[in-house]
C-alpha cells in the first residue's frame, strides 16, 4: 500500500531530501501535503512536480500569490500556522515528516500525534521545548515517533532487539563543526559565513550555526533523553570529526553497538519512512579500507559552553529547556544578521536562563508563555550588549 506523506518544512534541507527519497520509491510513497514557511518559489516547484492534495504556507501574506500560481492544479491551498496544524490531522495522511525549523514545529507535531499519525521527527526543538508533553501524548495515542536525525537514527537502530533497561551509556557523536580546532582567540572574530561552512553535512542555515556553536549537540542530548528514556548523565558526547560513526550504545555487559555510514541525511530519512524494513538504495557506501582513521575527542566546554548549558537546562528541568531554545533562536538569528558575536551567543543564553520565570511543572500554555518571555529577555540582553 502506498503511504501518504505530509511534509512540514518541505522546502528546507530535510524536506527536499525527503522528496529525494520519495522520488526513488514512487510505488511506496506519495505526497499528500506540502507545508512551508515562506519559500514560495520552491514550494510551487515541488507542488507542480508531486501534485499534492494540499499545499500550505505559514506566511499568510503569500496565500493569494500561492493560490494564483497553483491555479492549474486541483489542490487545496491553505495559509497560516493554524492551517498547518489542521493539515496534519487529515485522515488520508499516514506519516508526518516533522522537518519545520525551531519552535514553529511544536503545535503541528502535537496535533499530528493526537491524530495518531506516524511521526518522522527531524524537528529536535519539539522535544527540547516540551519533551515530557510530547512523550506522554505519544504514549496516550499509541503514536510511533521515528527519529530522522542521523545520531538518533543510529541509536534507534542500535537498540532494535535490545532491552532498554540494559543501556549503560549512549555515545552521541558530534563532528565538532567548522571551529573544532579554533582557539578562543580565533573564535572571537568568526562570522556567520565562516560558521556556515560545515565540514561534513549539508544542512539549513539555522542548524548549521547551531552545529558550529555545539548547541545542536546539546539539543540532541535532550532529544535522546526523551526518545530513549535515558537520564542525561548516561548520555556522553564524543567529538568524531569523520562523521562515519553516527552514534552508539554501550550496554551493561560492556558491549557497544554502533551504526556507521556516509554522512548523507537521506539514509536516516529513508529508514524512518520504511521502518521496520530496509530498502535497497544507491546512496554512497563507506569504503572501510579507504578510511585512514576514526578518531574521538572529548568536547571542550570552555570553547563550546552551549553544550554545557543544554546539560544544565535538563538538570534544572521544568520550562528551562524551553528558555534555552527560545534564547538560542534569538541569538542564532542575530548572529546570522551580524547583530551578535559568535562567543556572545552563549552569554546571552546563560543570562536569559538566569532571568526567565521558572515553572517546575509546565503545561502547554506555560511553554507558549515561556517562549515569548525568553525571546523578549534575550532581545533586551542583546540590545544592552550592542
Where are these regions (language model features)?
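Catalytic, metal-anchored helix/loop core of enzyme active sites in primary metabolism
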Residues: 1-386
